[in-house]
Amino acid sequence: MKKLMFVTDESILGGCARSGVAEVVDSLANSVAADYAVTVVCPDGNGVWARMAANLQQVSDGVRFCRLFGVDYYLLRRWPDGLNMVVEHTKPDVLHNFAAPELLTTLATRPPRCIYTIDQADFMQGREDTLRLYDAVTTVSKAYAIELLERGDQLSQVLGEINFRGITNGILTSVFAPEKGLMTSAKYSADDFSGKAVCKERLCRTYGIPADKCIYLMMCRLVRDKGIDDVLKAVHMIRDSGGFLLLVGKGEKQYEEQLAKLTRDDGVLWVNRWPSAVQAVPLLAGADFYLSPSVAEPCGLMPMTACRYGCIPITTLNGGLQDNMDDEIAVIVHEDGVTGAVAKVAALYAHPDALIAKRAACMERDFSWATRKAEYLEVYRGAV
């Protein structure tokens, strides 16, 4: 079996997660483990999974090893020191880099095939020409790939001259599985939503939300690109239509200051933290709708995950959201913004049969890597 190495500065299992990149790395690694002998090299964040691993080993000074869910993890205390050692030790046939593109130049021995994935265009500023070092470059959705090619800047010029494509991310549906009751208060499915009512009751008790409210959930970095301005304009519309906004996240000072002034009387509870995947799942299981009115969105992992829990997305169709969201499973935000979408949500919430049908459609939509990993396997094999 050929060897595939992921190089990343983010991994949930490695305990160094800051964004959706961490989830993508771990879930894609798990998904292709039947096709390749997979190794993940990442910073050692003393993650709970690593601490629980019975076979955690000290490989060398500052490098620990563990095997989790069929994938070998090398955890580096001093990132990225030690990467050369791991590459020499494992000798991968394919290296897939999710971290800084220039890391490839630090390797004493270049693997036969090297792939790079762009998650955020802003991260590439000043690094554009390093992409030419790779055999193939991908980004996290087909729609975002088109946006990058149409930017009219140095990045779009380089991408137009190299082997570049968009591959829409999937999620690990074996973990985000309400029918198994993993990380939720009760099991439920698209055929039986009784457990979701239990999860909502638990959420309301935990956060002191009146049980009769339609719960809008938003979990994100508090930045303009996530559509937070539009959400703040709609706060009182949400309240007056019988809703309650639970917003979890932290970010720019201007937004934190605005949220700090809002109270439960405004129908808002702001939780100033970024939840881990384990903490996010009970929120999705208990909430009715998930707000994702992004101005710019490379992929949109959270709306996909929300669908798994019957938490209906309220979303724009910007960036990667075009690849994943539509009217069947989401309330689409149009020119009238979140305020206009809230009116649609209130009407939907007032008709239980229609609400249940849309929730079921959400949960039944296939966002798994099973339908998407084939494109990555083509890239790894050099078929494209």
Give the label of every model feature segment.
Residues 1-384:
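Catalytic cores of nucleotide-sugar-dependent glycosyltransferases that transfer UDP/GDP/TDP-activated
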